[in-house]
Amino acid sequence: SQAIQLGSYNMEARNDAYFWRGESYYRMGEYENAISDYRTYLNNTRQRNTDMYALAYYNLGYSYFKLRDYSAALNRFRQYVDLESNRQAASLADAYNRIGDCLYPNRQFSLAEENYSRAVQLSPSAGDYSIYQKGFLLGLQKDYKGKISAMDRLISEYPESQYVDDALFEKGRSYVLLENSSSAAQAFEKLIREFPQSSLARKAGIQLGLLYYNDNQPEKALAAYKQVISNYPGSEEAKIALQDLKSVYIDLN
């Protein structure tokens, strides 16, 4: 801030100070103030071939993104990817993911998919998010087989990913929609077995009970519901399982 007050002393130092103050505001979650400072920096700096200039667009994109102003965020991320000279930069792959995320609420699915694909190409080691999102978008377009193959790719190529439990759940749901109950059950069972602490394991237990019930396997349905009740006492899913359990018993009698 001192450099900003002494602005006439050195214009470029003053402009850089706006960038750094914008950074501070961003880290504190004061996104409107961050936007104001980044924009002041971008409008006034004469040094436009620098890493800092490109990064300001990236940070500005994130500030808008945090405020859910996706169209403004989209424009800034696109400006950043045009300006970034280092094609290996982790922030470049990340920006393509965010571009995909900005296009998704406007239902521009194929464009979003393209950007997720670019992110995977640029940074294969961090491609799990991009592949998950691509699969999710395929599901929204009712391409359930495409979605399953994306989820399978994530599970096999990124076994340590934080998205593996999500991928198994979405895979199971896709098989349900394809009316392939045995493959759906396998996906849900694997999720429950390998990620018992995941909130999705509870949901998978309910799905499993329903699958077995609809598949005329009441004994297996009862076992699935009982497992949810005993493993996750007090949860919302345990309450649902108890209701469903009663319904199965009524049907059996």
Where are these regions (language model features)?
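Acidic, polar-rich low-complexity tracts and alpha-helical solenoid repeat scaffolds
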Residues: 1-253
